[in-house]
Design a protein with these regions (language model features):
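Proline- and acidic/polar-enriched loop/turn elements at helix boundaries
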Residues: 30, 93-94, 151-152
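Juxta-kinase regulatory segment immediately upstream of eukaryotic protein kinase catalytic domains
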Residues: 1-28
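Short, N-terminal intrinsically disordered low-complexity segments that are rich in Pro/Gly
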Residues: 2-7, 29-32, 60-67
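Short secondary-structure capping/turn micro-motifs that flank functional sites
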Residues: 34, 97-98, 155-156
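ATP-binding glycine-rich phosphate-binding loop
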Residues: 23-43
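Short N-terminal amphipathic alpha-helix/helix-capping patch enriched in small hydrophobics
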Residues: 13, 35-38, 74
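A cross-family kinase active-site recognition segment
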Residues: 122-186
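ATP-binding pocket architecture of kinase catalytic cores
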Residues: 44-148
Length: 187
């Protein structure tokens, strides 16, 4: 993925966010974590938002509507957790849909922006562990009352992932694409 393509996606999604939610995006800063899916922190006229683009090569939501339904259900659950007081980002629905789709078929979700950095394993203090336990308890209590998923939205496929990784690595090596090679090293 070249930068121009990502900038084009960000601009198209920003326009769609304005139409769907009435939120004007002033700036989109890419977040360089993860694999294929592009994420941005978008500064808006209201508050910063987190936007996740569901890459068609990874999720194929346009071919598998059941995947979209399952992912939307997990986003709905996350939003319910947020509304019940569990500390997690809220998700912006539009007409009860949690994954939005632009006119050209870009699929994305809009979430509240939450500042912070993950703590390294083993580095939480006693107060942080206590708070984590409280919110974990709230989460489990709320989820007991929620309609469960029919099946997980995503099933890990280690062999498939490794095949895809090797294919991408070989293509990047042949092309001398250092950006993709760096993504591969991090994945």
């Amino acid at each position: 993925m070249i930068t121009d393509e990502k900038e084009s996606w960000a601009a198209e999604i920003a326009d769609h966010v304005k139409k769907q939610f009435g939120i004007a995006v002033n700036q989109a800063t890419p977040i360089h974590k993860g694999w294929l899916n592009v994420k941005w922190k978008m500064e808006t006229d209201q508050a910063p938002i987190f936007v996740k683009f569901y890459h068609p090569d990874r999720y194929k939501l346009h071919l598998h509507p059941e995947k979209r339904t399952a992912i939307e259900r997990t986003l709905e659950l996350q939003n319910g957790l947020n509304l019940s007081g569990v500390r997690c980002p809220g998700v912006y629905p539009h007409h009860d849909r949690f994954i939005q789709e632009t006119s050209t078929g870009l699929h994305y979700a809009v979430l509240e922006w939450v500042e912070g950095d993950p703590k390294p394993a083993g580095c939480l203090n006693e107060a942080e562990m206590f708070e984590l336990g409280q919110h974990t308890g709230k989460m489990h209590k709320w989820l007991q009352s929620a309609r469960p998923l029919d099946k997980p939205a995503w099933q890990p496929d280690k062999e498939g992932y490794l095949r895809e990784w090797r294919k991408n690595w070989n293509q990047a090596m042949e092309a001398g694409d250092e950006i993709v090679l760096e993504w591969q090293r991090r994945s």
